[in-house]
Design a protein with these regions (language model features):
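Short glycine/serine- and small hydrophobic-enriched flexible loop segments
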Residues: 299-303, 376-384, 462-472, 584-591, ...
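Acidic/polar, glycine-enriched structural segments that form the non-catalytic walls/loops
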Residues: 3-7, 111, 119-124, 131-289, ...
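Extended, well-ordered alpha-helical scaffold segments
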Residues: 229-233, 251-258, 305-319, 388-408, ...
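Extended glycan-interaction surfaces of carbohydrate-active proteins
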Residues: 93, 98, 246-289, 315-365, ...
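Catalytic cores of secreted or luminal carbohydrate-active enzymes
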Residues: 640-679
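Alpha-helical support elements that line or immediately flank enzyme active sites
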Residues: 293-324, 523-536, 582-601, 605
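An extended acidic
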Residues: 2-109, 121, 134-136, 148-154, ...
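Beta-rich accessory regions
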Residues: 132, 138, 208, 470, ...
Length: 717
């Protein structure tokens, strides 16, 4: 996805620590941590609820670590973890036992429940100690705390900044840094003991048999020292309504329910207009605006309403490129890659295949080749789903600037949209697979930029055709120019991108500057379906490949075919499975006719649901690409983000694909063409078309009932 750390840098202890590797500090692992998110706040802890002073553990607000340690002891010992529960996306509950306390014997009799609730500026941690001992339990409870106000980029790089000095207050502690803010900790009831130097607060309790002791700790980041780049949405932004799914197979309904809970915590907005909501890309590394990620998440979630798409479009349009800047990658009309606070922007050590170099991204960075055409595609799709016409019309000027960038600036290598990092310290690869080795030949050689990615040509074609339709619909000029560009692009693509192996033809992942096809078989080809760039026979060839065992792991699509020399099921982009990548292919297959497309769609849906079950119905950013026949559940990718916006949004994309729902609110129609719904789906309610809730019911005999929607909307089956 974004700014990935290299293979040598990603090695670390499996416990989540950032231990020293062969090149120094390393990126912490995430797979054994419990996360809660209420953007711009997030917490990461062990399964026992403890935040120990190692790795990425802690409480973060605005990409700063407000707490780097939060450890509970009872009578000098840490409680023993029994279990935990994710409560929505922004809260956790941890259950533990106090070994050796209470009655003698092996049975535990003293328990601690720890409830963590995040808010946009911090968290409230509530503790309940229950005693089932026969006699009064006298206990001394302590919470040991630390704060380093480290930037998330430093933590990700494996650095361990020095802690700040604690100051005692009447009811807790505080830590301050004039440049980064004030962290305030308030305890209820007031602690009996505050050890300022050690960062410890403590209480003494006498707990009668069958009774409880309760206390709480509230933590807030105040006075950040610099204006926040993004904040929580306005309180009157209603959030998401969970679609209700009925099916003989329970997995899809459960995935939708928990995915929406994860999405709630990722909502953010700019301080100037907190009603324009977008989704942060993911926690912990990407809790901010990312052009590509935020666009795709909003696009996949259009069946839940167009409001998120509207906020995403406007937020990005306000930051659309206006000048030329090699350092930031900015160009007139270009949509940005990511935004960070100036003192928290990304700095990582990366590898280009031969040499280590510094990856240092500016606070506002435009190094993405695909966000610009995808912005146009999102505007068009949102219009079809019912985005108000006046709001669409207001965004036609930035749409025109996007298309001008596409034709005049982005399209320059043999007539294809391509990229190259001209700063020397930006992303070497600027598609969605942006790790250093993401674009490689079948024999494992790394391709050289400038590169024209296959899926980007599909986005560009779709954007040009969408732009033409939009300007015509609003009685504006320019449609012929965009259609001519699209036709030429399709002709060039057909002539240059297709390669063959023993199984037949498929599109290369990319073209190098001299036109050489980079011949790896990759999941990128799935993004071409439904864009309009391909004809029916070409779409069928791709559908067959997507269903093959080379790409289809049984848990979803591998990013790189298992037959490639560079395949590694636990690499970032060269063999792993990404839920959103698979969901995009599923959406394209739903728009492709023929038995091959249907078979591949059903298999990929089942694979994603199988994977979701293995992750407790909370799909991570990515996971291992091992074959389902070899494992009963997918292996986690150890540095994978969770929750992650487009992974969670994949659940809604699956639902829409199974329904085959394609609205055209401006045209007054909604098309439904369900794809072998049973056992995955029998009914769905709570979807939204044109601002109105709709429900779809499917019967075994093929009858389709569409309930609700705007007046005058005609059903096409």
């Amino acid at each position: 996805m974004n700014d990935q750390v290299t293979p040598t840098d990603v090695l670390s202890g499996g416990d989540g620590s950032g231990t020293a590797g062969p090149t120094g500090p390393t990126q912490p692992y995430l797979n054994n941590l419990v996360t809660a998110v209420c953007a711009p706040a997030m917490s990461l802890s062990r399964h026992d609820g403890q935040m120990r002073p190692e790795g990425v553990e802690g409480l973060y607000v605005q990409d700063l670590r407000a707490l780097s340690q939060f450890v509970l002891t009872v009578n000098g010992a840490e409680p023993v973890a029994l279990g935990y529960e994710l409560v929505g996306g922004a809260a956790n509950t941890f259950e533990s036992a106090v070994a050796g306390a209470g009655n003698p014997g092996p049975d535990p009799t003293v328990f601690v429940t720890r409830r963590r609730e995040l808010n946009p500026t911090g968290m409230l941690e509530s503790f309940t100690l229950r005693s089932h001992a026969r006699a009064t339990l006298n206990c001394h409870v302590e919470v040991r705390l630390a704060c380093d106000l480290a930037a998330i980029s430093d933590v990700r790089s494996g650095l361990r900044p020095a802690g700040k000095t604690a100051t005692s207050t009447a009811d807790g502690l505080s830590w301050a840094d004039p440049g980064r803010g004030l962290v305030r900790l308030v305890c209820t009831p007031k602690p009996a003991d505050i050890q300022e130097g050690a960062g410890v607060v403590g209480w003494d309790f006498a707990v009668e048999p069958g009774r409880v002791a309760e206390w709480s700790v509230a933590v807030q980041l105040e006075d950040q020292g610099a204006p926040a780049v993004f904040v929580a949405p306005a309180s009157n932004w209603g959030g998401f309504t969970v679609p209700q799914v009925e099916a003989n197979d329970h997995r899809l309904g459960r995935l939708v329910e928990l995915s929406v809970a994860d999405l709630e915590g990722l909502r953010m907005a700019a301080p100037a207009d907190r009603s324009d909501v977008f989704l942060a890309a993911g926690a912990p590394w990407y809790l901010t605006l990312f052009g590509r990620d935020s666009i795709w998440a909003a696009r996949l979630l259009l069946p839940m309403g167009s409001e998120l798409a509207e906020g995403t479009l406007r937020t990005l349009a306000q930051r659309q490129g206006r000048a030329f800047d090699k350092l930031t990658g900015e160009e007139p009309g270009k949509i940005l890659h990511e935004v960070r606070p100036p003192d928290r922007s990304t700095y990582l050590k990366t590898e280009d295949g031969h040499n280590h170099r510094a990856l240092s991204l500016p606070p506002v960075y435009y190094g993405t080749v695909d966000a610009t055409p995808l912005w146009v595609c999102l505007l068009h799709d949102a219009w079809k789903w019912g985005m108000p016409a006046d709001e669409v019309e207001r965004l036609l000027p930035p749409m025109r600037r996007c298309l001008t960038w596409l034709t005049d600036l982005g399209c320059h290598s043999h007539g294809f949209v391509s990229y190259i990092d001209e700063s020397g310290q930006g992303l070497a690869n600027q598609g969605w697979k942006d790790s250093w080795d993401a674009v490689q030949f079948r024999d494992g050689r790394i391709a050289s930029a400038p590169l024209a990615l296959c899926e980007v040509q599909g986005y560009a074609y779709e954007a040009a055709m969408a732009g033409a339709e939009l300007v015509e619909a609003f009685d504006q000029e320019g449609a012929d120019r965009w259609r001519e560009f699209a036709a030429g692009l399709a002709k060039r693509f057909r002539a240059r991108f297709w390669v063959e192996d023993s199984q037949g033809a498929y599109p290369a992942i990319a073209l190098e500057a001299d036109g050489t096809p980079v011949d790896s078989l990759s999941s990128n080809i799935g993004h071409l379906l439904g864009t309009g760039l391909l004809d029916a026979s070409e779409s069928d060839l791709i559908a067959r490949r997507l269903g093959s065992s080379e790409l289809n792991s049984g848990f979803g699509l591998r990013t790189l075919a298992s037959s490639s020399a560079g395949f590694n099921p636990l690499s970032y982009h060269c063999g792993s499975v990404w839920a959103h990548d698979t969901a995009i292919a599923i959406a394209g297959l739903a728009r492709t006719s023929g038995a091959s497309a249907r078979e591949a769609l059903v298999s990929l849906v089942d694979g994603l649901l199988y994977a979701a079950e293995g992750f407790g119905y909370r799909l991570p950013e990515l996971y291992g690409g091992h074959a389902r026949g070899d494992l009963s559940a997918p292996l986690p990718y150890p540095a994978s983000c969770h929750p992650q916006a487009w992974a969670a949004a994949s659940s809604i994309a699956i639902l829409a694909a199974l329904l085959g729902v394609r609205p055209d609110v401006p045209g007054g129609t909604v098309e439904l063409s369900p794809v072998v719904a049973d056992p995955f789906l029998t009914s769905a309610a709570g979807l939204r078309v044109g601002g109105s809730e709709v429900a779809v019911r499917l019967s075994r005999d093929g009858e389709i009932r569409f309930i609700g929607g705007p007046k005058g909307l005609r059903l096409v089956v």
